[in-house]
């Protein structure tokens, strides 16, 4: 009806209704009878309305735009007005500055013109003479100040030569500008990061002083003197580097020169100057300025200007001044001018004798004035001033006068230096105010500007070297360090007391300031390390050597006093050792005697451990709680001593020491570098450690270090930190409960974790307690997890940091596995220097070898490098240095299992991700050790010699046997895994498996059956995959050695895998990464980890294939964890997938676990993740195997390019299908391309885990392998055909993979997936391998 009605309506007015927009009224009326016309009308209405609105909006917009334009125009005009005013003000300012002189001159000129009109030419000349003389004096003063600042030709030119000198001054002034205004620190440098002013803190004052000095030299000498004094402070602080050397001599010369200047100008000038200097010394700048203004302002200007700069050319300028005085007297007939000339020059001499100048008014004037006063009398005091803590704050001066600083320190003329400091503080309240400030971030600036400059000029010559080093490294903590040094300077007469005090204050400061204390410690360590703070990282390696050597020397002998005088840092560190060592050496004397009884290696390792681990943990532990750690170490050590762990302690300590030596080599360099870099890494590690550890930068290491120290100490490996000996032996009186209490004291997080881990290690806690401790250990483990997670997170935070952290974690994982304390040390140390860790390790081993002659670093290094190529690599060699030194002890490697296993749970807690691969080996080792612990400590004692080897191997995640060329490829850990699987089932089972593993030729963990023979030393040559029989090291057959190495490493791997397997079994409980933490804790608990692992492993060796695959799962887990960091993901997958595929049981589970485990692996081997991420794509299998074996696969990869393909791959292959792979691959194993053939092979080997004889294998698997896998051999030989095309690794990997998938039909799918990954990896791998990626 509506339509009809509208239709009826439409005909009369249809067009208008449709076409025209309706009005509101029409719409209302039609609302009752709505029609299409109404719709059309409404539409028209709305359209019109919208158009109107849009048009209005556009109009408004135009109006607004117009307003905006007008506003902008007004704004521009307003700014133009502002600019006009600014220009006017600037013009007036400039004019005023010019007119200050010219106004008077203009007035004088007007008067002179009037006078000229009235007077004759002669009168005019007479009037002009004084003006000319004044102008000449001003010019000479300016030139002198410029020359003195620059010290170039100032001394060479006489007053007659002032014109030439002025030209020279013009040339020299820019230098003065930079002297006065030091350039900012290099962007990103430690000082740059540490100091808010970025080295330009004094710029504002210096700029004003530079401008006002030069502008106001003529204008207002008061400003000029003040600014010049500021400039002198700055220039001296800047020149201190150059001047400290010259100033030391020049100050003595100044004393002499002052004597000469005094003799020449004593009567009037020196007395006047000394009087003015005396007045000036006690007085502030205003007083000095007033005195100078009252006195001869121009003379004093000259004096101040010349004095600020003459320091360098004091004698030259004095010589120039004396003739200049005569000539100036001649030039300036007025006696006042001659007096001024004499007083400026004579006063210059006097100023130099006084050490005064406008620039030196308070800083140098006081220094030099006091020098004339005190230098004749206080010449020793001025020399003693250098010991004063603050003068040493200048880095340049410290660098220049390093030796001077130390003699001064040893001279400990702190009382005179304090006197002078007090004198300077008293004369200049502002300075004294600066005296506290110099300790601040800008100590250099403050000290430079203030008395500290005076002190610097005086003291900086000698002491600055010492404290300058420290403060150059840690200027941020200069207050603390300055105070420390003040205490030193004060207490240096009692050097040992000051050392103890410093160590206490340092411990307090470090305890109070986790990060800052660590930074301090780092800076102190840096002080030890490099003369140059920036170079501290590089020099830390060397200077740390020197410092470490003195430490090693001084620590064995009364360490605190000896190193105190040598290095400020060493003073503090030695005082750390002194107080720590005093504290702990007193306690460590007990442990030392005990540990001496244990192994002779421990003392040497102590030296390295004390040198490095003590340095690290002196920093860390002192930072954390010096006494707490001592008590914790004691209690822990007592637990171990009370337990049958004393042998383990000796071994663990040896391992920790050996590995700490190695870790110290690695880590200590890194700890030193790290300490130096911890500042640098404060950006990366600070955030990571602070964020992740929850502690300071060092909080992570502190947390982990407390846990490490507690754990490590509980594990005898702990003692090395402060008193590896002491702590491991102090324990005799302490109860496990005390350990728990001490550990809890050390750090809430680490304490619980440590207690739990220690109790777990010692079996003190039941499985439930251990599991409970596991969570608490998760706490400490969370630091390990944090380490693992940090390793992962650090991937984000700092690629190198994580890699370095990985490397650190690897080395620390290895070291922590041997001694968690080392792991934590390593974690704490390498993390900072992770980027340069490899180089540092390379150098650090040398350095630490030099530093730690006691450690078998040198013997170890030579032997290890030759024998550890695959496992040890360069760094492995370093770690293998101890391996090699423990190579002597290596025959005891079976003990290594037990020791490693005990230690590994703890270290695995910290380093689960890291340890998953290494930890797997070392877990098994560790668990085996509990078996041996249950069986008795004797194995550990017998392992004591191999404890270092175990440490190094564990730390390297390298079984010496695993280092064997074929053994390195054990990754699947087929045979050892089964034995290890038995280990996880129960400690008794483990001990049984320990026995069974040694029974197996390859089952012997570190070639245990051969003890040392099968161990890494044979394979340690980085360049040779084939083990060079180093005499006693290896079984005659490499097959047996492979088997022993594989089983030992795979036993370890299985133990680590056991952690992952426990993860796999308990994987629902925790994510892969997380549960390994529990697993390490459980591993430390052993019962819980065994319980968790027991279900899969209770079969023990029976589970060889399934357990291997199971372990392969856990390993792939480890590998998967490594995946994050590793292009090695491919490798962990290839490796994990190989092991997973090889153990078909893991077919479904391995990917997730392998990913988790791989992460752990890569975490365990940060270097691998570093280098492997780049290299692992190509090295997928090798780096992984290398990861298991080598914490430093990068170097290994480089060295292993030729040897590692055999060494690593063969080492890792032998246990898994890799024996046959080793055959095919060994044929090409020397070839870079062999790695990819090996990658598929490990998968096959997993299946045909029996040794596949590699006819071409360097490791002579021909005999054992032929018996094991002829079929896989042929298959792998077929793959070897593709292996010939190493570049086409995909062909090899595909052929090998297809074949591998056949033997691994169990996990054929997983194998195919992972092999496809391998193919991809191998596609990339061959190029890298061809280029020597491995």
From Swiss-Prot:
Motif segment (LFa 6): 658-670
Residues bearing PTM Phosphothreonine: 322
Cell compartments where the protein resides: Early endosome membrane; Cell membrane
UniProt keyword list: Cell membrane, Endosome, Membrane, Phosphoprotein, Protein transport, Transport
Residue stretches of biased makeup (Low complexity): 201-213, 541-561, 1297-1311
Motif (LFa 2): 441-457
Alphabetized InterPro entries for the sequence: FAM21/CAPZIP
Compositionally biased residues, Polar residues: 513-530, 584-594, 601-611, 908-919
Location of the region described as Interaction with VPS35 in the Swiss-Prot/TrEMBL record: 348-1334
Motif segment (LFa 12): 1164-1178
Record function comment: Acts as a component of the WASH core complex that functions as a nucleation-promoting factor (NPF) at the surface of endosomes, where it recruits and activates the Arp2/3 complex to induce actin polymerization, playing a key role in the fission of tubules that serve as transport intermediates during endosome sorting. Mediates the recruitment of the WASH core complex to endosome membranes via binding to phospholipids and VPS35 of the retromer CSC.
Assembly and oligomerization: Component of the WASH core complex also described as WASH regulatory complex (SHRC) composed of WASHC1, WASHC2, WASHC3, WASHC4 and WASHC5; in the complex interacts (via N-terminus) directly with WASHC1. The WASH core complex associates with the F-actin-capping protein dimer (formed by CAPZA1, CAPZA2 or CAPZA3 and CAPZB) in a transient or substoichiometric manner which was initially described as WASH complex. Interacts with VPS35; mediates the association with the retromer CSC complex. Interacts with FKBP15.
Name of the protein in its database record: WASH complex subunit 2
Origin species: Mus musculus
Species lineage: Eukaryota, Metazoa, Chordata, Craniata, Vertebrata
């Amino acid at each position: 009806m509506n339509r009809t009605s509208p239709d009826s309506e439409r005909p009369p007015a249809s067009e208008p209704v449709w076409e025209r927009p309706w009005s509101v009224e029409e719409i209302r009326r039609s609302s009752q009878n709505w029609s299409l016309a109404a719709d059309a009308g409404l539409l028209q209405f709305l359209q019109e309305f919208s158009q109107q609105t849009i048009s209005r909006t556009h109009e408004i917009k135009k109006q607004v735009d117009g307003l905006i334009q007008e506003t902008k125009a007004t704004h521009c005009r307003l700014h133009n007005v502002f600019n006009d005013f600014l220009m006017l003000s600037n013009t007036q300012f400039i004019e005023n500055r010019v007119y200050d002189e010219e106004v008077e001159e203009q007035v004088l000129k007007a008067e002179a013109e009037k006078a000229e009109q009235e007077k004759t030419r002669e009168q005019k000349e007479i009037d002009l003479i004084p003006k000319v003389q004044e102008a000449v004096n001003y010019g000479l003063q300016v030139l002198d100040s410029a020359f003195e600042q620059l010290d170039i030709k100032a001394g060479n030119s006489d007053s007659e030569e002032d014109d030439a000198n002025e030209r020279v001054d013009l040339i020299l002034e820019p230098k003065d500008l930079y002297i006065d205004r030091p350039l900012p620190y290099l962007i990103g440098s430690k000082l740059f990061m540490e100091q808010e002013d970025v080295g330009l803190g004094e710029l504002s004052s210096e700029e004003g002083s530079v401008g006002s000095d030069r502008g106001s030299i003529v204008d207002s000498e008061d400003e000029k003197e003040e600014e010049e004094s500021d400039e002198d402070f700055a220039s001296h602080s800047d020149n201190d580097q150059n001047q400290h050397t010259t100033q030391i001599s020049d100050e003595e010369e100044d004393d002499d020169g002052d004597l000469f200047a005094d003799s020449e100008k004593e009567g009037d000038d020196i007395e006047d100057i000394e009087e003015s200097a005396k007045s000036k010394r006690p007085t502030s700048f205003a007083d000095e300025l007033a005195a100078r203004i009252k006195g001869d302002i121009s003379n004093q200007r000259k004096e101040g200007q010349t004095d600020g700069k003459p320091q360098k050319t004091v004698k030259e300028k004095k010589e120039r001044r004396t003739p200049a005085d005569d000539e100036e007297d001649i030039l300036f007939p007025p006696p006042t001018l001659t007096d001024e000339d004499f007083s400026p020059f004579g006063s210059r001499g006097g100023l130099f004798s006084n050490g005064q100048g406008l620039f030196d008014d308070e800083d140098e004037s006081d220094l030099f004035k006091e020098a004339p006063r005190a230098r004749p009398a206080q010449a020793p005091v001025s020399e003693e001033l250098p010991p004063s803590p603050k003068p040493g704050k200048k880095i340049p001066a410290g660098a220049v006068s390093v030796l001077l600083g130390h003699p001064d320190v040893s001279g400990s003329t702190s009382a005179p230096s304090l006197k002078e400091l007090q004198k300077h503080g008293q004369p200049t309240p502002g300075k004294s105010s600066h005296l506290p400030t110099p300790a601040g971030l800008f100590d250099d600036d403050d000290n430079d500007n203030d008395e500290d400059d005076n002190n610097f000029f005086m003291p900086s010559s000698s002491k600055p070297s010492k404290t300058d080093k420290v403060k150059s490294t840690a200027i941020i903590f200069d207050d603390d360090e300055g105070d420390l040094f003040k205490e030193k300077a004060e207490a240096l007469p009692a050097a040992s007391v000051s050392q103890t005090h410093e160590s206490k204050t340092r411990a307090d400061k470090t305890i109070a300031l986790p990060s800052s204390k660590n930074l301090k410690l780092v800076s102190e360590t840096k002080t030890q390390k490099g003369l140059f703070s920036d170079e501290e990282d590089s020099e830390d390696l060397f200077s740390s050597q020197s410092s470490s050597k003195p430490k090693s020397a001084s620590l064995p002998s009364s360490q605190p006093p000896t190193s105190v005088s040598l290095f400020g840092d060493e003073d503090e560190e030695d005082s750390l050792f002194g107080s720590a060592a005093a504290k702990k050496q007193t306690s460590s004397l007990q442990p030392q005697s005990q540990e001496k009884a244990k192994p002779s290696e421990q003392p040497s390792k102590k030296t390295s451990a004390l040198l490095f681990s003590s340095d690290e943990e002196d920093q860390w532990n002192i930072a954390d709680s010096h006494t707490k750690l001592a008590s914790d170490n004691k209690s822990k050590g007592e637990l171990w001593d009370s337990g049958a762990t004393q042998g383990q302690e000796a071994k663990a300590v040896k391992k920790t020491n050996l590995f700490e030596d190695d870790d110290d080599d690695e880590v200590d360099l890194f700890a030193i570098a790290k300490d130096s870099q911890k500042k640098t890494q404060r950006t990366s590690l600070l955030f990571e450690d602070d964020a992740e550890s929850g502690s300071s930068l060092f909080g992570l290491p502190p947390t982990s270090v407390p846990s490490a120290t507690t754990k490590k100490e509980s594990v005898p490996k702990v003692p090395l930190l402060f008193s590896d000996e002491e702590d491991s032996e102090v324990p005799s009186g302490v109860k496990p409960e005390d350990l728990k209490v001490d550990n809890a004291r050390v750090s809430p997080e680490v304490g619980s974790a440590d207690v739990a881990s220690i109790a777990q290690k010692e079996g003190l806690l039941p499985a439930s307690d251990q599991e409970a401790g596991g969570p608490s250990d998760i706490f400490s483990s969370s630091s390990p997890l944090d380490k693992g997670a940090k390793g992962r997170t650090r991937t984000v935070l700092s690629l190198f940091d994580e890699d370095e952290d990985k490397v650190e974690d690897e080395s620390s994982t290895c070291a922590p596995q041997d001694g968690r304390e080392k792991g934590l040390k390593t974690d704490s140390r390498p993390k900072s220097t992770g980027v340069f860790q490899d180089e540092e390790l390379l150098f650090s081993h040398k350095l630490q070898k030099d530093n730690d002659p006691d450690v078998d670093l040198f013997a170890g290094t030579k032997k290890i490098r030759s024998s550890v190529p695959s496992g040890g690599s360069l760094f492995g060699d370093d770690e293998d240095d101890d391996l090699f030194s423990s190579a002597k002890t290596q025959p005891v490697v079976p003990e290594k299992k037990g020791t490693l296993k005990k230690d590994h749970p703890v270290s695995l807690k910290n380093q689960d991700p890291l340890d998953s691969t290494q930890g797997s080996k070392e877990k098994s080792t560790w668990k085996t050790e509990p078996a041996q612990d249950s069986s008795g400590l004797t194995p550990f004692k017998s392992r004591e010699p191999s404890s270092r080897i175990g440490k190094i191997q564990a730390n390297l995640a390298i079984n010496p046997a695993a280092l064997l060329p074929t053994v390195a490829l054990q990754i699947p850990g087929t045979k050892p895994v089964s034995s290890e699987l038995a280990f996880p089932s129960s400690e008794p089972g483990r001990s049984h498996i320990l026995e069974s593993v040694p029974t197996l030729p390859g089952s012997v963990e570190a070639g245990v059956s051969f003890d040392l023979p099968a161990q890494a030393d044979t394979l340690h040559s980085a360049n040779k995959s084939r083990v060079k029989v180093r005499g006693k090291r290896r079984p005659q057959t490499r097959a047996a050695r492979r088997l022993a190495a594989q089983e030992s490493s795979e036993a370890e791997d299985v133990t680590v895998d056991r952690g992952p397997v426990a993860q796999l079994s308990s994987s629902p409980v925790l994510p892969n990464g997380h549960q390994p933490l529990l697993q390490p804790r459980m591993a430390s608990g052993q019962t819980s980890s065994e319980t968790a692992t027991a279900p899969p492993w209770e079969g023990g060796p029976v589970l060889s294939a399934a357990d291997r695959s199971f372990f392969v799962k856990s390993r792939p887990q480890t590998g998967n964890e490594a995946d994050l960091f590793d292009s090695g993901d491919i490798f962990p997958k290839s490796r994990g997938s190989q092991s997973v595929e090889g153990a078909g049981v893991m077919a479904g589970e391995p990917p997730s676990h392998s990913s988790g485990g791989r992460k752990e692996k890569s975490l365990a081997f940060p270097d691998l993740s570093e280098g492997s991420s780049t290299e692992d794509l190509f090295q997928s299998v090798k780096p992984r195997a290398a990861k298991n074996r080598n914490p430093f696969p990068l170097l290994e990869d480089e060295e292993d390019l030729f040897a590692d393909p055999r060494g690593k791959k063969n080492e890792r292959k032998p246990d898994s299908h890799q024996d046959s792979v080793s055959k095919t691959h060994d044929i090409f194993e020397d070839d870079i391309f062999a790695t990819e053939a090996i990658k598929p092979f490990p998968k096959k080997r997993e299946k045909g885990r029996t040794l596949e004889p590699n006819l071409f294998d360097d490791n002579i698997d021909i005999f054992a392998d032929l018996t094991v896998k002829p079929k896989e051999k042929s298959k792998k030989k077929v793959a070897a055909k593709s292996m010939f095309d190493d570049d086409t690794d995909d062909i090899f990997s595909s052929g090998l993979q297809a074949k591998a998938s056949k033997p691994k039909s169990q996990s054929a799918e997983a194998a195919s997936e992972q092999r496809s990954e391998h193919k991809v990896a191998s596609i990339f791998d061959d190029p890298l391998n061809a280029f020597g990626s491995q």
